[in-house]
Amino acid sequence: MITIRSLRPNDYHAWQALWRGYLAFYKTELAEHVYRTTFERLCSNDITTQNAIIAQLGGEMVGLVHYIFHPHNWRVEDVVYLQDLFTAPQQRGKGVAKALITAVYHASDQAGCPSVYWMTQEFNHQARHLYDQIGQLTPFIKYTR
């Protein structure tokens, strides 16, 4: 059975291992201080815009999701950006990612936020199969600086 809960301060090493796996998928590496700072923000009671939820199977952390509440100029309510979602490779196909996204939907609803959005790379076919079932594909293209 999948257990979903908020990230806790004593989760650092298990969280870091999962996040490193996520970043490796996208061929990205970060400095150690970025891991520490991000983790501290995600666990902080003073920073309520950045959040993290983890999934456990048999007491082992097997998935994570990071999400951010932020204002939107076209709405009165905040919206939620689901920034990072990762399931340990050996646990894929067991409903972990869907459970994590559902938890973000629930947090968004509880906060009165009408919209949750996220991005993925075009080649991420396995994830896109799930996203096509629980979200709506938009025609937007992302640019960055």
Positions of predicted regions on the chain:
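A short helix-loop-beta-strand connector motif used in the catalytic cores of GNAT acetyltransferases and
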Residues: 42-54, 81
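Conserved GNAT-fold acetyl-CoA-binding loop/helix
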Residues: 19-41
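A short beta-loop-alpha structural element at the N-terminal edge
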Residues: 3-17
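Conserved beta-strand in the GNAT
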Residues: 54, 60-69
